């Protein structure tokens, strides 16, 4: 399996601009089918504590972008997104993994929040270490 890491200068809290940057990089990279593409934590917004403004549902625009990217290129796509909370709770800093058909394969909510950066004041920590198989290889997502 090929693994590709995508690092770029994120446009602060501007999802469409960041989607366009990822699209351009992937088009240029010409990744082989089945590649695992790794996008940064909160790649569509930057590491923002403005959770209420940037949070979206698990089927929101960033998840749709990732699913479409995976299906269009026949690759796995893993990236960070802020997911809206249930009523009365804080949003979660999550990573979503889509398979080459664009289906959500796994999701993980960051467990160890970055307290010095104020993350714990704005986000709800995750509780589970979502394990999954990728090409018969046991894997686990982590967000630093």
For every predicted segment, state its role:
Residues 56, 86-144:
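Active-site catalytic loop in hydrolytic enzyme cores
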Residues 7-12:
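Short polar catalytic/cofactor-binding loops
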Residues 6, 37, 140-142:
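Hydrophobic positions in the central parallel beta-sheet of the AAA+
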Residues 13, 47, 113-116:
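Conserved protein kinase catalytic core
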């Amino acid at each position: 399996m090929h693994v590709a890491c995508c690092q770029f200068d994120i446009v602060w809290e501007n999802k469409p601009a960041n989607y366009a940057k990822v699209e351009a990089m992937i088009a240029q990279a010409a990744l082989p089918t089945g590649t695992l593409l790794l996008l940064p934590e909160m790649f569509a917004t930057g590491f923002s504590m403005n959770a209420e403004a940037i949070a979206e549902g698990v089927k929101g625009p960033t998840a749709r972008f990732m699913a479409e990217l995976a299906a269009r290129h026949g690759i796995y796509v893993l990236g960070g997104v802020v997911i809206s909370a249930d009523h009365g709770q804080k949003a979660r800093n999550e990573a979503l993994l889509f398979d080459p058909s664009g289906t959500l394969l796994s999701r993980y909510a960051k467990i160890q929040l970055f307290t010095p950066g104020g993350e714990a004041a704005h986000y709800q920590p995750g509780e589970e270490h979502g394990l999954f198989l990728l090409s018969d290889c046991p894997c686990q997502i982590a967000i630093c």
